[in-house]
């Protein structure tokens, strides 16, 4: 269910020729049909969220095709022209290097980088935002970047919740409770949901849910009896906050609305929104 202000609406793309119009309409239809409430203050916020999701998917596929390597933190490596590898295996931005240039280099020269899946997801988020921000704004927000698991910049505002409905562009986690300790890096897999039942995970590639579970199950202890599974934890970029930095030159998606109800009372507790 999508709410703009106090109005429950069914949105639709008005320009079928704009880039990724079909994919955007699919995302809108999924959100409108879900039981979960997606609340936005304005239509521009919804437009930003929609374009952000599309760019997350694009960035995930670009990273997959870049040659970016899967490595544990002990074996991680990065391009020393832009990053310094820390003692824990993270990537620290070198002084006087614009974050925008360094993030783009990961996608241009993926073979010069290797790390594990959580860091890859954060890299995808940064790249998606870079597609919607002016470089000056991006560099100001994310100066002194450190890429290391979930240690992301304080200005990157994320929402993690349990029990939401899956939407393309969401980050979701597969858990492998009986992983073989010899390959502990396969205790789970962070993935971006691409839509149409496919996920991208750094290390497993683009696969269906069943294929990722099969891959993780192959890395369990001998005689394991508990299967890997897709958890109900979802992580998203907070569009309400991050939309305020969007470039004015970024084309807005043209969205019109079929009103369903205009007197909704919207209550939000934590990251869960309820309609009365």
UniProtKB/Swiss-Prot annotation:
Asked if the keyword Ion transport belongs to this entry, the reply reads: no
Query: What EC number(s) has UniProt assigned to this enzyme?
Result: 2.3.2.13
Which InterPro entries would you find in this protein's record?
Gln_gamma-glutamylTfrase_bac
Question: One of this protein's GO BP terms?
Answer: sporulation resulting in formation of a cellular spore
GO MF terms, alphabetically ordered: protein-glutamine gamma-glutamyltransferase activity
Keyword annotations? Acyltransferase, Sporulation, Transferase
Note the superkingdom of the native organism: Bacteria
- Name of the protein: Protein-glutamine gamma-glutamyltransferase
**Gene name, Swiss-Prot/TrEMBL:** tgl
């Amino acid at each position: 269910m999508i709410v703009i202000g106090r109005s429950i609406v069914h949105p639709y793309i008005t320009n079928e020729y704009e880039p990724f119009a079909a994919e955007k309409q699919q995302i809108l239809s999924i959100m409108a049909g879900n039981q979960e409430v997606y609340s936005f203050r304005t239509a521009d916020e919804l437009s930003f969220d929609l374009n952000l999701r599309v760019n997350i998917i694009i960035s995930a596929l670009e990273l997959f095709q870049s040659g970016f390597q899967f490595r544990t933190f002990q074996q991680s490596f990065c391009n020393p022209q832009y990053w310094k590898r820390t003692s824990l295996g993270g990537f620290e931005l070198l002084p006087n290097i614009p974050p925008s240039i360094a993030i783009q280099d990961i996608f241009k020269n993926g073979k010069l980088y290797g790390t594990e899946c959580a860091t890859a997801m954060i890299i995808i988020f940064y790249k998606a935002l870079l597609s919607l921000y002016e470089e000056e704004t991006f560099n100001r927000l994310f100066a002194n970047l450190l890429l290391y698991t979930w240690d992301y910049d304080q200005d990157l505002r994320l929402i993690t919740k349990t029990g939401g409905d899956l939407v393309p562009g969401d980050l979701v986690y597969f858990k492998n409770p009986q992983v073989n300790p010899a390959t502990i890096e396969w205790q789970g897999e962070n993935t971006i949901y691409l839509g149409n039942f496919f996920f991208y995970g750094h290390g497993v590639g683009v696969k269906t849910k069943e294929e990722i579970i099969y891959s993780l199950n192959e890395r369990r202890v001998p005689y394991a009896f508990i299967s890997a599974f897709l958890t109900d934890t979802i992580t998203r970029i907070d569009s309400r906050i991050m939309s305020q930095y969007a470039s004015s030159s970024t084309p807005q998606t043209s969205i019109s609305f079929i009103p369903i109800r205009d007197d909704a009372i919207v209550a939000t507790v934590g990251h869960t929104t309820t309609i009365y």
